[in-house]
Design a protein with these regions (language model features):
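Conserved small/polar residues in nucleotide/adenosyl-binding loops
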Residues: 165-172
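Nucleotide-activated donor-binding/catalytic signature segment of Leloir-type glycosyltransferases, i.e.
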Residues: 9, 18-40
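Aromatic "clamp/platform" in nucleotide-sugar-dependent glycosyltransferases that forms part
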Residues: 60
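A short, well-ordered alpha-helix in the C-terminal region of glycosyltransferases
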Residues: 119-134
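Short alpha-helical donor nucleotide-sugar binding micro-motif in glycosyltransferases
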Residues: 39-40, 47-52
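Short hydrophobic beta-strand element within catalytic cores of glycosyltransferases
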Residues: 77-80
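Conserved acidic donor-binding segment of nucleotide-sugar-dependent glycosyltransferases
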Residues: 92-93, 97-104, 113-118
Length: 172
């Protein structure tokens, strides 16, 4: 099995530091198959989404996970952790895989499965129009604005409730 790894958003020095932390000797890494892309503009990012067969980001923290929605709109099955918002976008065993721990072997097996089994790509392709409609930047921006407007409308109600709850009542 031969694969190439494209790392976007990471600086080479950060990758080398991470390898050293894990006691992997930098000189043992096949740098011919690892491409450190750094920060990409949207046009370049589109090129790489179109080049890849799977999107993998088993992040320790991903508050919203919009990057998974973005990858799905390009027809890419996704691999992420079963934490935070990743499970909102990835349906385990259907549109990708959710990994539970930090086991590199588990990650490698899931990558192999997603790359070898066409059902993942077929399912993402089947849902692609829905992803494009529901996760367009306009639609996401509308949702975020809606939540912010609701919070703004409701803030006085919550502040009053909080004040009522925390204010001591006179007993004399």
């Amino acid at each position: 099995w031969s694969a190439e790894l494209y790392l976007a958003g990471a600086k080479e020095s950060d990758i080398r530091d991470a390898l050293r932390e894990r006691q992997i000797r930098v000189e043992e890494v096949d740098w011919q198959k690892i491409h450190l892309l750094g920060d990409l503009g949207s046009e370049k990012l589109t090129d790489y989404y179109n080049l890849c067969d799977v999107f993998c980001m088993p992040s320790y923290f991903e508050a919203y996970g919009l990057v998974f929605a973005e990858a799905l709109t390009y027809g890419l099955p996704c691999i992420g952790r079963d934490k935070f918002a990743m499970s909102e976008f990835i349906e385990d065993g259907c549109t990708g895989r959710l990994i539970s721990g930090e086991d590199a072997e588990e990650l490698a097996l899931d990558l192999w499965e997603v790359l070898q089994d066409p059902k993942y790509r077929e399912e993402v392709e089947r849902r692609r129009e829905w992803y494009l409609r529901e996760y367009s930047w306009d639609k996401v921006a509308q949702r975020i604005c809606s939540v912010m407007e609701k919070n703004e409308r409701d803030k006085d109600q919550y502040r009053s409730a909080c004040l009522l709850y925390t204010s001591p009542s006179p007993r004399d």
